[in-house]
């Protein structure tokens, strides 16, 4: 059963995890956002609710 022979696929799996864990996180974390998020105001809006005529 050739799928049980780990020599062809084990090195590929280890190398791909090496790429994922070593190279990709610094590249992803280096991205910057163009706009910093601002805090929303904590004021409550003074709007009246609209009653629906159910007749």
From Swiss-Prot:
Keywords: ATP synthesis, CF(0), Hydrogen ion transport, Ion transport, Membrane, Mitochondrion, Transmembrane, Transmembrane helix, Transport. Coiled coil: none annotated. Pfam families: ATP-synt_8. One of its GO terms (molecular function) is proton transmembrane transporter activity. Disulfide bonds: none annotated. It is a single-pass membrane protein. The chain crosses the membrane at residues 9-29. GO terms for cellular component: mitochondrial membrane; proton-transporting ATP synthase complex. GO terms for biological process: proton motive force-driven ATP synthesis. It is found in: Mitochondrion membrane. PANTHER family: ATP SYNTHASE PROTEIN 8 (PTHR39937:SF1). Component of the ATP synthase complex composed at least of ATP5F1A/subunit alpha, ATP5F1B/subunit beta, ATP5MC1/subunit c (homooctomer), MT-ATP6/subunit a, MT-ATP8/subunit 8, ATP5ME/subunit e, ATP5MF/subunit f, ATP5MG/subunit g, ATP5MK/subunit k, ATP5MJ/subunit j, ATP5F1C/subunit gamma, ATP5F1D/subunit delta, ATP5F1E/subunit epsilon, ATP5PF/subunit F6, ATP5PB/subunit b, ATP5PD/subunit d, ATP5PO/subunit OSCP. Subunit 8, of the mitochondrial membrane ATP synthase complex (F(1)F(0) ATP synthase or Complex V) that produces ATP from ADP in the presence of a proton gradient across the membrane which is generated by electron transport complexes of the respiratory chain. ATP synthase complex consist of a soluble F(1) head domain - the catalytic core - and a membrane F(1) domain - the membrane proton channel. These two domains are linked by a central stalk rotating inside the F(1) region and a stationary peripheral stalk. Belongs to the ATPase protein 8 family. This is ATP synthase F(0) complex subunit 8. The lineage of its organism: Eukaryota, Metazoa, Chordata, Craniata, Vertebrata. The gene is mt-atp8.
């Amino acid at each position: 059963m050739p799928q049980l022979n780990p020599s062809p696929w084990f090195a590929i799996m280890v190398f791909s995890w090496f790429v994922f864990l070593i190279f990709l996180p610094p590249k992803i974390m280096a991205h910057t956002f163009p706009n910093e998020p601002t805090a929303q105001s904590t004021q409550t809006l003074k709007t009246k609710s609209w009653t629906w005529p159910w007749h």
